C-alpha cells in the first residue's frame, strides 16, 4: 500500500543518514596498513588480481538485479499514479527472477563453495571483531572472513527469506490473472488464503524496497567500492584480498589449497 511504501522508503533513508553520520563522526577503526604490508610481503606468490566472481556469478547478479528493479517499478509506480499495463511486465519479471534463483541454487550447490555464504555460530568471533572496530578499538590479529564478509552473508540470508516468500506467493497469484502459462483459476484457494497470500507478497515487496536501498548505499560507499568493482570486473587486488579476507578460509589459485567459486 501507499502507507507501507512510504514507511519503507522513510526507514531506508533514515538508516542511510544514520549510518553515514556514524561513519563520519565515529572512531571507526580501519584495518592496519602495516599488517597488510606484512601480509602482502609474505604472499608475493599470489597473483596481483584475484578472481572473486566468475562471469556466470556476475551474470546471475545483474539479471536478478534487473528483474528486481522491474518488479519494484511495476509494483509501486501504479500506486503513485503512473498508469500502464503493469501486470504483464510484473509477472514476466517475476518469472525471470524465479529462473535466475533456480540457476543460482544449482550453480552455488555444484560449482561453488556452498557453505561459504551461510551464517552460523562460527561467525561470532568475527561479529565481535566488527563491533570492537566500530567502537574504535584496534584488534590486531583479529579473525577475518572467508570469501564473503559477515554483512554480505546476513544480507544474503535476508534476501533468501524475502525472495522465497515473494516467489512462492507470486507464482500462486499467477492463477488470478491470464498469463497463458497457467490456467486462470481463482478458486484454487479460499478467500482467507488468498488474503494471506496477497498480504505476504505485499509485505515482502515493501521489505525489498528497504533491502535494495541498503544494498545500493553500501555498494557506493568508498570503503566498499572494491567489492562493487569485483561484481563488475570479477577481480579484486591481492592487497584487498589480504586486507579483508583470511587466506586459510578462502584459498585462491596460487595458494596451497584452492576453493571453487
Task: Identify the role of each PLM range.
Residues 1-261:
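Membrane-embedded alpha-helical bundles that constitute the cytochrome b-like, heme-associated redox core
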